[in-house]
Design a protein with these regions (language model features):
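Glycine-rich phosphate-binding loops at beta-strand->alpha-helix junctions
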Residues: 64, 199-228, 239-243, 370-373, ...
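Conserved phosphate-binding/catalytic loops in two-lobed NTP-binding clefts
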Residues: 76-80, 226-245, 384-390, 540-559, ...
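Acidic, glycine/GT-rich loop-and beta-edge segments that sit at the periphery of enzyme/chaperone cores
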Residues: 106, 253-309, 416, 567-632
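Adenine-nucleotide phosphate-binding core of ATP-dependent small-molecule kinases
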Residues: 165-196, 479-508
């Protein structure tokens, strides 16, 4: 008889095998991080259930099991080895194992030796990720599978971490997307994460076995894997227990059950962990703290029987919905704070129903709504005003502290911070796409440890040694918490430590403050997270100042919206908001349709509310609403795409030559097009990127850490092969053209050398002539000779004269292209000056004009009636200046020069586009920010990736415009 234990990140599995390796007992239980207690409990139970188990050979495996195994003297079997042993025993001939656990994901390639791919520090695409998403959708985890089977369409959702995914999903929910479609999209995201992130370019083929909880319980998830891989994998009986079975199969010695149970019970960590000072020394100090904060109080009056003027404010937030009713004096007549449960419209209706039920005769003079769900709620209930949430929170903060210098709002999954200068918002910080440091971050931890958030927060108030967890992402923090637990930290220490880490993350990761002093001394804190006294105390300790936390900290967005409605109406008139009769007749119907008005073919979610009111979501431009094509005459991004489209293929005797429309080719295509057309090739480029194109090359991406624009190259190359290209030209280019803006003119390493990655990771590239040699376009004098040497190897009939002539015309073509871009940019600027429009420099890289990379951000911004130019239009206008960093990259030198020029103009603002995974941008963003802020310009950064929902982008742009209005 053999017994195996698998101690995973979230659950413990225990099996007993008989002498013929048949499973005779199994158990599968969640341990809520109380690992030792649970092991003791399971071993005691097994002993009562199975006769003779005391003589069984015992071994232990699993990601959380090594420390326990060492301390109690049980053999530890590495889990990958255990899985392989079990697979070879029970399913001989297995080629690939895909295993998803609670927080870990693995692919085991068993053919031709063992090769293992595991997730490192990110739990994206694992069971914990699906768990989080189920919570967000407000459905039971076990219902996710059935829900996904009912899908009609899918959305693009990032699965690298739960936080990115929330950034995608929350706006979809707020816009009325069907939960079944989102559930299927979540499963597709998990597949995408596993295939692209773990396989890293190696093909998944042969006999595939699915293991682990998510793949065992969710048949639709297995179907998603099958569809993506073009195969039919098997999920064996007892797939949950393969690691435990493998451990049992490797067990070689018996144990003394009583002794092991006793040792496990008494297992304690070393007690060696870094810790901070306590939040409160004693109850008395805590009481003083509570009394001080009780002074920032909003007076409350009864709504029932109130006959004066009333103002309604609503905040449809990312995870919660808030509503308030105020009187003329700003006193609170009624308030509601509820989870949105993925349906802000229904919750807002509930709020209004309650208001009318308490006071059927209420005289609502004006109303306003803010937050992620602003647009849909405004349409649904005919609310008078919409207000961007940054301004709503600022309005509320001023009510409590008119001379406020700094406001920080920590909500469910977003952090908003504003610096105030001369009574106006001077600078805005929003968390890009990471919610460590937000309310949901704490909630996730509390739930994982088996606590309600309110109880969990209180635990940390008097902790003696709050763990120093640093300021890290949720998943990194998971490993830190586990390590601290192993080292003997108590739940109280961990609770206090997490509160401190939230604050540090907000201050040093989001705001990127070098010290708390630069934020000012007059601070208002708001957002539901600050109702947590531990977080508030940690913030005051870190800042070194006493701050103001209103007693309605969680309602400040709605309160600010109500104050805004009051100010706009001047206390006169009647609100258009749906009245009691209208609510009784209220309907909300959702249907899905394809737009079809342009190549994007956006999947639209159409919300109808009766009486002709509609809200359309999922559109990347206003065309489905206005029925007109967007005006592109003042949009440089649109102009550049049209310019590239003007280069049509010309038949050539040397065959079809394809160029991937990716990375630097968005700028260099005119050069190479003319060069090879003159050499008698039929030159064409791959289509602009789409989601489908990305997926065509996804399985060959060798690293998930590379930026999204680089990942797209694989899809472009595969598409060119499918389009019948005989030759694919994608050269390595260490240098770019010298524009005399910086100290040198390198391309970044990814742009320069990605062709090498393609050559070594795409099997199909061998089907065509692939030219990826190194070329030096920055040296016009010796380019023809070097190009001839490289190309004549592939095309021996080429002559040096042909290449010389083609090169001469190619340089002319590139110069013509640059002139057209500059001329068009100058035309846009001149027209904007004449019409008095704001000019936005949308600064990024050449490839940021790719519609799949920018997700229509240019069209969204131009919808605010501003002119858009790119950084290369204004960079030549700047005088040469010294930067604080080594200015050696062409694209980055443009950014710095553009930022410098923008500081010299009152009518220009710079918005920087940054792709996730761009290492060099860690430097450029700080430098661009410094250049702009040195002349009191607002720095706005938009991080883009596979995420397609522009809700957060819209908030950022509207906040910038609102700050400029108040300037």
């Amino acid at each position: 008889m053999k017994l195996g234990l698998d101690i995973g990140s979230t659950r413990i599995k225990c099996v007993v095998l008989d002498d013929e390796n048949k499973l005779i007992y199994s158990t599968y239980e969640r341990h809520y991080s109380r690992i030792t207690e649970k092991i003791a409990e399971i071993l005691a139970l097994v002993r009562t259930r199975i006769d003779g188990v005391e003589n069984a050979l015992v071994a232990l495996s699993g990601s959380a099991g090594m420390g326990v195994a060492e301390s109690v003297g049980v053999d530890f079997i590495q889990e990958v080895y255990a899985t392989r042993v079990a697979a070879n025993t029970f399913i001989p001939g297995t080629d690939v194992i895909i295993e998803l656990g609670g927080e870990d994901a693995k692919i085991l390639f068993l053919t031709n030796g063992l090769e293992v791919r595991m997730n490192g520090t990110c739990a994206g695409g694992t069971g914990a990720f699906i768990d989080q998403m189920a919570t967000l959708l407000n459905v039971k985890l076990e219902d996710m599978d059935e829900l996904a089977k009912q899908h009609e369409k899918t959305y693009t959702i990032a699965s690298r971490c739960g936080v990115f995914a929330k950034t995608d999903i929350q706006p979809l929910l707020n816009q009325g997307a069907r939960k079944s479609d989102i559930a299927e999209s979540i499963f597709n995201a998990v597949v995408s994460q596993t295939v692209a992130g773990l396989a890293q370019g190696r093909e998944i083929e042969g006999q595939i076995v699915y293991l682990g909880g998510p793949l065992t319980f969710m048949s639709e998830l297995r179907n998603c894997f099958d569809r993506t891989l073009g195969t039919k994998g098997i999920c064996p009986e007892n797939s949950l227990y393969y690691v435990a079975c493998g451990a049992a199969l490797c067990a070689e010695k018996t144990i003394d059950f009583d002794e092991v149970i006793e040792k496990v019970k008494n297992y304690r960590g070393s007690g060696n962990f870094a810790f901070n000072q306590p939040l409160f020394k004693n109850e008395e100090e805590y009481k003083e703290f509570c009394d001080r904060h009780a002074k920032a109080d909003v007076k409350q009056k009864e709504l029932k029987g109130y006959t004066g003027k009333a103002y309604i404010g609503m905040d449809a937030g990312s995870t919660t919905v808030k509503g308030v009713v105020l009187n003329d004096d700003g006193e609170l007549l009624y308030s509601k704070y509820l989870p949105s449960k993925g349906n802000p419209v229904e919750i807002m209706k509930q709020f209004l129903d309650e208001v009318y039920e308490i006071n059927p005769e209420i005289n609502v003079v004006s109303s306003a709504v803010t937050g992620y769900g602003e647009d849909i709620v405004k349409n649904a209930f005919a609310v008078d005003y919409g207000i961007v949430e940054t301004i709503a929170h600022f309005t509320a903060a001023k009510y409590f502290m008119p001379d406020v210098e700094f406001i920080i709002d920590i909500g469910g999954q977003d952090i908003k911070c504003f610096k105030i200068h001369n009574g106006a918002i001077d600078n805005i910080f929003l968390n890009e796409a990471c919610s460590s440091g937000c309310g949901s971050f704490l909630q996730t931890f509390a739930n994982a440890l088996g606590y309600e958030i309110a109880d969990f927060a209180k635990l940390g108030l008097f902790a003696k040694r709050p763990v120093d967890l640093g300021s890290r992402c949720t998943v990194f923090m998971n490993s830190s918490v586990k390590q601290a637990q192993k080292d003997g930290a108590t739940i109280e220490d961990i609770s206090a430590g997490l509160s401190l880490s939230v604050v540090k993350n907000a201050l040093y990761k989001v705001i990127r403050a070098s010290s708390p002093d630069e934020l000012g001394k007059r601070v208002v804190v708001q957002g539901g997270t600050f109702l947590n006294d531990a977080v508030l105390r940690a913030f005051e300790q870190e800042m070194g100042v006493e701050v103001v936390r209103p007693n309605i900290a969680g309602l400040m967005g709605a309160y600010g919206a109500a104050l805004y409605a009051k100010k706009k109406s001047k206390g006169v008139g009647k609100s258009t908001i749906t009245d009691k009769k209208g609510l009784d007749e209220f309907v909300h119907e959702i249907k899905v349709a394809n737009c079809g008005m342009c190549n994007n073919n956006c999947r639209l979610t159409i919300n109808s509310f009766g009486k002709g009111r509609k809200f359309i979501a999922g559109n990347r431009c206003e065309r489905p609403i206005t029925k007109k094509a967007p005006a592109n005459d003042m949009n440089m991004y649109a102009y550049k795409l049209n310019l590239i489209d003007s280069y049509k293929p010309v038949e050539g005797i040397r065959g079809k030559l394809g160029i991937p429309m990716a990375l630097n080719m968005y700028e260099l295509y005119p050069f190479w097009y003319r060069f090879f057309t003159e050499l008698k090739f039929e030159v064409f480029h791959s289509p602009y990127s789409t989601r489908k194109l990305y997926q065509r090359g996804q399985q060959t991406i060798p690293s998930d850490t590379v930026c999204f624009p680089a990942k797209l190259v694989h899809g472009h190359i595969q598409t060119l092969i499918d389009m019948g290209a005989e030759t694919i030209f994608y050269p390595c280019l260490s240098y770019n053209f010298d524009e005399h803006l910086g100290d040198n003119h390198y391309n970044c390493p990814v742009v320069a050398y990605y062709p090498e990655v393609i050559k070594n990771n795409m099997k199909d590239i061998r089907k065509v002539h692939f030219i990826k040699e190194y070329f030096g376009i920055h040296r016009p004098n010796d380019f023809p000779k070097k190009a001839y040497e490289r190309l004549s190897f592939h095309f021996p009939d080429l002559t040096l004269n042909e290449v010389r002539n083609a090169a001469k015309l190619a340089y002319q073509e590139q110069e013509n292209y640059r002139k057209k871009v500059i001329d068009k940019g100058n035309e846009i600027i001149a027209k904007a000056e004449k019409e008095g429009k704001k000019i936005f420099v949308l600064a990024g890289r050449p490839y940021h004009i790719d519609p799949e990379i920018n997700h229509g951000i240019d069209r969204l911004i131009s919808g605010f009636d501003v002119a858009i130019v790119s950084e290369d239009v204004v960079s030549p206008r700047a005088e040469h200046f010294r930067t604080h960093v080594l200015n050696q990259w062409t694209y980055h030198a443009r950014l710095y020069a553009a930022a410098k020029y923008v500081t010299e103009r009152k009518d220009m603002e710079l918005v920087q586009l940054v792709s996730f995974g761009c290492g060099v941008d860690a430097i450029t963003t700080d430098e661009v920010r410094e250049i702009l802020e040195s002349k009191n310009k607002i720095y706005t950064q938009i991080k883009i990736d596979e995420i397609t929902n522009l809700g957060a982008v819209k908030i950022r742009i509207r906040s910038l415009l609102a700050a400029l209005e108040n300037d």
